[in-house]
Amino acid sequence: MDANGATERFNVEAVNSQKIRQPLYAPRKKIFPKRATGTFRRFKWLIMAITLGIYYLTPFLRFDRGPFSPNQAVLVDLANRRFYFFFIEIWPQEFYYVAGLLVMAGVGLFLVTSTIGRAWCGYTCPQTVWVDLFLAVEQAVEGDRNARIKLNAAPWSLGKIVKRVTKHGIWLVIGFLTGGAWILYFADAPTLLHDFFTLHAASVAYFTVGILTATTYVFGGLMREQVCTYMCPWPRIQAAMLDENSLTVTYNDWRGEPRSRHAKKAVAEGRKVGDCIDCSACVAVCPMGIDIRDGQQLECITCALCIDACDGVMDKIGRERGLISYATLNDYNANMALAGASETTAVDPARIRDGATGKLVPGLRHTTWRSIIRPRTIVYFLVWAGIGIAMLVALSLRSTLEISALHDRNPQYVLLSDGSIRNGFKIKISNMRAEPRTVTLTLEGLPGGLMTRADTVEPPSSSLLFKLQPDAVMETRVFVRADPSALESTVTDFDFAVRAVSGEATASTHAKFEKPKEQRP
């Protein structure tokens, strides 16, 4: 109350009242994409066939590596800790090659995005490929866009139930095949298939197939565009990869505006008319449910189906194709300026067409090879190629023989009855070839050093002979002895050297020989 006892009234409004409160998440509006036809749609069919063919058929490819190695061309052998890719075999200690492949994939993604935008999202992303496949099934079972909208709005009937059960059944089969193909990369495919269907496979195989069946069905059939919009981080990241010379799917409003659904009537009335007849064909085919005419949007995956739809309309009305096209921001801005667009004036269709012929004027800018080959993309390509070349060189020069030595912790040394000092070592020798090998182990840099195997009673020798199994690691324990009078310090550095008897490979590892401090030469 104020001084006079009157109640004070406040001029304030509840900004978060029940009446105006907005939900945290926008409710999803179901999208019914129309079947598109054209160059980019055919290209997407081709990419889908290639990528799905590679995924489903690769586990069945055979590659002869000899009698001692698996003959599956691509295999992730978790039990034996090996990764096979045709003639390449990666061991656990060589995981840096896998890291190199991941770096190459990342740089390659940057390269593609900086040149042709989100082409990965629009053509080869697994989510896009499987959604395309699921949509093809939906269109085959329920019909094109109008038929699906009508079916969705219709009350439940026997016909609707049959179509829905058929569609979702096929989707589940696709999900099952997707999960089934995945596990075939981790074991011999024919053997695992037999064990799987005879219920003799490991429980993890059934669990993995079940999880991937469910995720494929949910992501590809039910969530679709929501995965790209809300779950995938790439739409947010790709903005940093684009510049004014990157190709993106663009609505060229410098020739499309002003829109008119009745162009002839508008022209007769003396109004300016652009090429866009506002038919919304570009919206009808979009799997993300956006209108490309609103400009660049986070949801756009640059699948270019709107280009096909618009080109078809332009053909029907006798206009040039390319109202929606791949374009760079620089080209777009230049053409907008040519059309007279500014902050205060709209585009003038008459400025971009020859008054006599009605064709587009020659001064318009179009995409050229300079949009792709520029300093930024060259740097990306050189980095990508450099990593690839370095990995190929490393693979071609790597040794197929490796050795490691671990000194015994307790006791560090033993004083023998003849006055010599003995140290124990755990030796691992890796035979990284798919054939048996015989190797010799020697000491380098240890004066008068001799060796014996811990599991034999043979006399000490300057070298030891070992037979290695193909593609395997041999572990053994050796005793190294030396005359302390020949050693200058309490710790002497030396090397274990291993050499194949055939002479084609050698390897060595560093070690230390210890003796007591009180021992005097």
For each feature predicted by the language model, list its residue ranges.
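Membrane-embedded alpha-helical bundles of multi-pass integral membrane proteins
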Residues: 2-259, 307-308, 324-383
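Cysteine-centered iron-sulfur cluster-binding motifs in ferredoxin-type domains/subunits
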Residues: 113-128, 220-235, 266-314
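Hydrophobic alpha-helical transmembrane segments in integral membrane proteins
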Residues: 389-413
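Short, solvent-exposed loop/turn segments enriched in Ser/Thr/Gly
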Residues: 420-425, 474-475, 489-494
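Short solvent-exposed strand-capping/beta-turn motif centered on an Asx-Ser/Thr pair
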Residues: 430-436, 485
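Short acidic, flexible loop segments centered on an aromatic residue
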Residues: 435-450
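Intrinsically disordered, low-complexity Pro/Gly/Ser/Thr-rich segments with frequent PxxP/GP/PP motifs
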Residues: 453-485
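Terminal connector regions
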Residues: 482-521
